[in-house]
């Protein structure tokens, strides 16, 4: 039987092992963890804007918003610590054909915080919160564009890849400006300065034009990969939901930008007097086309999930954000078209996203405590 000193040695060894595991977790941390922010943030946004509200729902959204901010800064601190201690890991991450694609999750997760500031804080705190969100949005837009332009070029010049090894994760760095453009539409709608709003939406249209067509190109390549090489490995099968992300968020973004254009263009005498109405109508029309295109990709994803078992990993957060932004387009169409059908669909999708968030968040916490996600 161990003596008192023996027990002390055992405890010290256990403490050292725990510290070693913590450092291993930090060392193995990668940008994909910011998908937790994406999923948590979009769930808060959906609950805050649910077409059919009930008492207390707003407070649930506020709790998720606060939780999302805490998680974001926690992950940001870990990331800074990781790259400060091991600078070579940053270069290794950029050179990694999979981890570099996950860089897009950082600005997209940040965008959900900006949107929540508009939806939750501005009605309470007033115009200064809108201006604060506007400043944050410029940071998010800059990072999103940098990632969208840089990472695909790395894919062309540095990464070793093939059609067979491709997954829908190729979309992640490209979707970041789509999310930023949609977020810009939300922020611009809250700005009282029409000139600032005009500048914002014009930048958003350019970002949308940079990213959405390129995302369509990736979708064509991805469909070819599926047709020639069949479904992706089961470990990455949840990524089958990613294609509905740019379609849903792109559609929502165009509608939201159109709403702001219809208000701001006539006030500033920008283009023709009818220009704002044209932007609004064309945005709604293109959004419907994109939403319909998203439906068939949603079907492909759901059908893929039935083809066999797949086990939990951090990629399961793709159950939340892509469907979540598709839902924002759905609820926005319900609002703009005054359609009960889209309101009901948006509510249904929102409930599904919230349920998926509860499941994936619980599994993430459990697997993090057991250190399984850091191995």
Swiss-Prot record:
Its main location: membrane. Glycans are attached at residue 193. Residues 1-25, 81-101, 157-167, 222-234, 299-309, 365-375 are cytoplasmic. The chain crosses the membrane at residues 26-46, 60-80, 102-122, 136-156, 168-188, 201-221, 235-255, 278-298, 310-330, 344-364. It is found in: Cell membrane. Keywords: Cell membrane, Glycoprotein, Membrane, Transmembrane, Transmembrane helix, Transport. It is a multi-pass membrane protein. GO terms for cellular component: plasma membrane. GO terms for molecular function: sulfite transmembrane transporter activity. CDD domains: TDT_SSU1. Residues 47-59, 123-135, 189-200, 256-277, 331-343 are extracellular. Disulfide bonds: none annotated. PANTHER family: PTHR31686, SULFITE EFFLUX PUMP SSU1. Belongs to the tellurite-resistance/dicarboxylate transporter (TDT) family. Sulphite efflux pump required for the secretion of sulphite as a reducing agent. In the presence of sulphite, cystine in keratin is directly cleaved to cysteine and S-sulphocysteine, and thereby, reduced proteins become accessible to hydrolysis by a variety of secreted endo- and exoproteases. Excretion of sulphite mediated by an efflux pump also represents a detoxification pathway for dermatophytes during infection of the epidermal stratum corneum, hair and nails, which are rich in cysteine. This is Sulfite efflux pump SSU1. It comes from Arthroderma otae (strain ATCC MYA-4605 / CBS 113480) (Microsporum canis).
């Amino acid at each position: 039987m161990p003596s008192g000193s023996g027990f002390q040695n055992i405890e010290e060894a256990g403490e050292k092992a725990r510290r070693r595991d913590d450092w291993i977790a930090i060392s193995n941390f990668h940008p994909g963890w910011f998908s937790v922010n994406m999923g948590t943030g979009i769930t808060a946004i959906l609950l805050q804007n649910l077409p059919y509200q009930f008492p207390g729902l707003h407070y649930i959204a506020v709790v998720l918003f606060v939780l999302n901010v805490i998680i974001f800064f926690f992950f940001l601190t870990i990331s800074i610590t990781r790259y400060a201690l091991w600078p070579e890991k940053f270069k290794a991450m950029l050179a990694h054909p999979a981890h570099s694609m996950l860089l897009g999750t950082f600005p997209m997760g940040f965008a959900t915080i900006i949107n929540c500031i508009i939806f939750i804080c501005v009605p309470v705190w007033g115009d200064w919160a809108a201006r604060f969100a506007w400043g944050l949005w410029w940071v998010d837009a800059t990072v999103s564009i940098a990632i969208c332009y840089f990472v695909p070029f790395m894919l062309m010049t540095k990464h070793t890849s093939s059609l067979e090894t491709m997954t829908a994760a190729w979309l992640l760095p490209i979707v970041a400006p789509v999310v930023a453009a949609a977020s810009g539409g939300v922020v611009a709608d809250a700005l009282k300065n029409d000139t600032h709003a005009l500048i914002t939406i014009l930048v958003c249209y350019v970002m949308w034009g940079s990213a959405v067509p390129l995302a369509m190109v990736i979708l064509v390549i991805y469909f070819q990969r599926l047709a020639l090489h069949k479904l992706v490995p089961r470990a990455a099968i949840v990524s089958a939901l990613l294609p509905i992300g740019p379609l849903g968020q792109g559609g929502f973004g165009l509608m939201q930008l159109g709403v702001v254009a219809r208000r701001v263009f006539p006030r500033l005498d920008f283009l023709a007097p009818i220009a704002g109405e044209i932007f609004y109508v064309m945005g709604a029309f293109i959004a419907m086309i994109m939403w319909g295109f998203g439906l068939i990709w949603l079907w492909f994803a759901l059908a893929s999930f039935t083809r066999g078992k797949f086990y939990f990993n951090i990629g399961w957060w793709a159950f939340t954000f892509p469907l979540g932004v598709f839902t924002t387009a759905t609820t926005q169409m319900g609002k703009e078209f005054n359609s009960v059908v889209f309101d009901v669909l948006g509510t249904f999708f929102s409930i599904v996203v919230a349920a998926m968030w509860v499941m994936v968040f619980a599994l993430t916490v459990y697997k993090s405590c057991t250190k399984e996600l850091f191995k």
